[in-house]
Design a protein with these regions (language model features):
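C-terminal catalytic lobe of FAD-dependent flavoproteins
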Residues: 248, 257-258, 273-396, 403-414, ...
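Flavin-dependent oxidoreductases
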Residues: 15, 175-180, 184-264, 268-278, ...
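Helical element adjacent to the flavin cofactor pocket in flavoenzyme catalytic cores
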Residues: 138-195
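N-terminal Rossmann-like FAD-binding beta1-loop-alpha1 element of flavoenzymes
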Residues: 2-29
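Glycine-rich FAD pyrophosphate-binding loop
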Residues: 22-42
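Iron-sulfur (Fe-S) cluster-binding segments and ferredoxin-like electron-carrier domains
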Residues: 404-415, 438-456
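Dinucleotide-binding Rossmann-like beta1-alpha1 core, especially the glycine-rich loop
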Residues: 46-126, 250-251
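Short beta-strand to alpha-helix junction loop
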Residues: 62-65, 90-99, 138-157, 275-280, ...
Length: 479
């Protein structure tokens, strides 16, 4: 019997697992996909928000502010790409200037530091590629950009090194309570746990209703994006927002930590698993973004993608212990600023577990930092040392991103192994560049198959079932 079962291995579930790993607790993450961070966590704007947007007094406001600080600390400690570049909310009319004042006041109430309203002159000096129709902007220098999947992986891997188990390809189909123990039915048998943390993202309402009365409903909301080549990465220096509206923070234009430019999202109701992109959605994103930054060359787009947000009617996080089922804790409605808030929510979940009866006895010895060898960021001297120690680091596999065979082998053998081409991409960036794996994809697939001692046909692109190869032609071809 586990002490705690965490359902869902997105950023929220991984953050809770990371915190639980510091204590003598038997914990497990249960995830239906074949890797962590493959839902909303891998498909969002990758922004650590400032905290001026949420309504004062909400859980969003509280945790966004705390998370803005704590997430940065964790990224430094766990070697996760993060840059504090600040954000600008741009106004294009006198009416929108009033919105900037309202946002600034809201930010002051929430505790956001160092905000300023810039006039047109200062704005265009700092951001020369902005539209000259911009009249003013709210500056929030505490805003950061991050690699969301690398953060979730860092938290989950550290948790694993500290004794937390991860069960992938394990889908929850039912939950029953017997005495003080929850019996979680899955496609891989029954998992027993004294406490449940429901961090199931867009499916959190369904998981909640397996055991509890319906207390909230998630309305999945899809957002579509462009990812631009690095040739566009220096167009803006800050995260550029337009004034928010009832649909959310609107279409942003921002650098990424890897040097690209991200543009999006729109906002439309969708099915929970609908990550398709549409001409209508992408046209809207493109036309709206060009109002802010008219010089974006959309011919330099290297990928389109969509992510689904877990929206709730009251636009706030639902973080509470069920009143009828002791030890069942919901962490739901984790829409924006969910990524910014998750790391700060996790320590409070541990307090809730403790108040519900879980004994938290700190471990004497834990892993709480990590280092990743990123070949392209090393000096020539350090590269030479690494190649001498391990010749696989002297062989470039992904030319676009300068990723070596050594990095790919390391990705396959990390605490949560990479078993698909995209799982390697999330761990070391192979396949993230201009050709999107067109050149290195087959070579990465061969390395994974070799390292895991599996047939090449068993290595998928991403999720289970996304197989690329059906068999060897000389062996009779397709199975």
């Amino acid at each position: 019997v586990y002490d705690v079962a965490i359902i869902g291995a997105g950023i929220t579930g991984c953050a809770i697992a990371y915190e639980l790993g510091k204590y003598n607790v038997k914990a497990v993450i249960v995830e239906k996909e074949n890797d962590v961070s493959v839902g909303t966590t891998k498909a969002n704007s990758a922004i650590i928000h400032g905290g001026y947007d949420p309504k004062p007094g909400t859980k969003m406001a509280e945790y966004n502010i705390k998370g803005n600080v704590y997430t940065k600390e964790l990224c430094e400690k766990l070697d996760v790409p993060y840059k504090q570049i600040g954000a600008l909310v741009v106004a294009f009319s006198e009416e929108e200037k009033k919105t900037l004042e309202e946002l600034k006041q809201r930010g002051i109430t929430n505790g956001v530091p160092d905000m300023e309203i810039w006039d047109k002159e200062k704005l265009l000096k700092e951001e020369p590629n902005l539209s000259d129709k911009a009249v003013a902007a709210l500056s929030s220098p505490n805003v950061g950009i991050v690699s969301p999947w690398e953060l979730a992986l860092a938290l989950a891997e550290t948790a694993v090194l500290n004794g937390v188990e991860v069960k992938l390809n394990t889908e929850v189909s039912g939950i029953e309570k017997e005495n003080d123990t929850y019996k979680i039915e899955t496609n891989n048998g029954v998992i027993e746990a004294k406490y449940i943390c429901n961090a199931a993202g867009v499916f959190a309402d369904k998981v909640n209703e397996m055991c509890n009365e319906k207390t909230f409903e998630i309305t999945p909301n899809k957002g579509e994006y462009y990812l631009m080549d690095k040739s566009q990465g220096n167009l803006v220096n800050h995260v550029i927002f337009q004034c928010p509206n009832e649909k959310g923070k609107g279409v942003l234009v921002a650098p990424t930590v890897h040097g690209n430019l991200i543009v999006g999202p729109d906002s439309q109701p969708s099915a929970a698993n609908d990550v398709s992109t549409t001409k209508q959605g992408l046209d809207f994103v493109r036309n709206t973004a060009l109002k802010s930054v008219p010089g974006i060359n959309f011919r330099e787009s290297i990928r389109n993608f969509a992510g689904v947000r877990a929206r709730t009617a009251d636009h706030d996080f639902h973080i509470y212990e069920d009143k009828n089922n002791k030890g069942f804790i919901n962490i739901a409605g984790m829409q924006s600023p969910g990524l910014s808030s998750a790391c700060a929510i996790a320590p409070d979940i541990l307090k809730m577990l403790e108040n519900s009866g879980l004994t938290l006895e700190a471990k004497e010895d834990i892993v709480d930092e990590r280092h990743i060898d990123r070949f392209k960021h090393l000096s020539h001297e350090d590269r030479a040392k690494l190649v001498e120690k391990n010749p696989a680091f002297g062989k470039i596999i992904c030319r676009c991103e300068t990723i070596t065979e050594g990095e790919i082998i390391n990705a396959v053998h990390r605490p949560i192994p990479a078993t698909s081409i995209d799982a390697v991409k999330r761990r070391c960036n192979a396949g993230m560049g201009r050709c999107q794996g067109g050149f290195c994809g087959p070579r990465v697939q061969e390395i994974i198959a070799r390292e895991l001692n599996k047939p090449l046909a068993d290595i998928p692109q991403d999720r289970l079932g996304t197989n690329i190869i059906t068999g060897e032609t000389k062996d009779g071809g397709a199975k």
